[in-house]
Amino acid sequence: VILSDYGQGVVNDVGADRVIKTARSKNVPIIADPKLTGLHRTHGVNWILFQSQGLELMRRRLGVSTGSEAAMKLIETHDWNHLVVLSGEAGVTIYSRDEEVVHAPCTLDDLRQMIGLIDAAAVAIAVAISKNMSVRNTALLANAACECILGADKTESFVLSREDLIDRIGEMSWNLQVSKR
């Protein structure tokens, strides 16, 4: 289940609670892209998506020193399993309740735009869940999906496809092999 709150009133307290409880009772993983003012609606969600600015804002609100401290405090407070932070040029970081922090750096030199970044990451995470991928591989897949968006020329006509993702992963793999030489 993917819950994405655009602040239009569709994801309200009662509805979110019902969806989350039903999904959890059937062991269906939940991915959420919450409004920072609606974090209370995400208690018990498996995967939460933030952009780096959101984590920085929460760090200040919580009065902690680092983004990592803020992430772990949010995970504990809201009973999340994972907090995925999308940082554009800095890549993707996944903070987890029971695992080490994983970071996948962005490999692009030319970032063109960020519209659709969270949606692309949510889809990548859903695919990773369906394939039982590790948190590390989930970070790599989410980062590849984000790089497809970050490198796209035109967002209004760009649709993230399986082929785009395969091509991006191939490029990332090639770059990694070349850098190890």
Language model segments and positions:
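Non-cysteine beta-strand/loop elements that form the S-adenosyl-L-methionine
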Residues: 45-53
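Short, ordered loop/turn segments at secondary-structure junctions
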Residues: 6, 35-37, 53
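Short acidic, glycine-rich surface-loop motifs adjacent to enzyme active sites
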Residues: 1-10
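Nucleotide phosphate-binding site architecture
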Residues: 56
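Conserved phosphate-binding/catalytic region of the ribokinase-like
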Residues: 13-29, 34-44, 59-61, 65-181
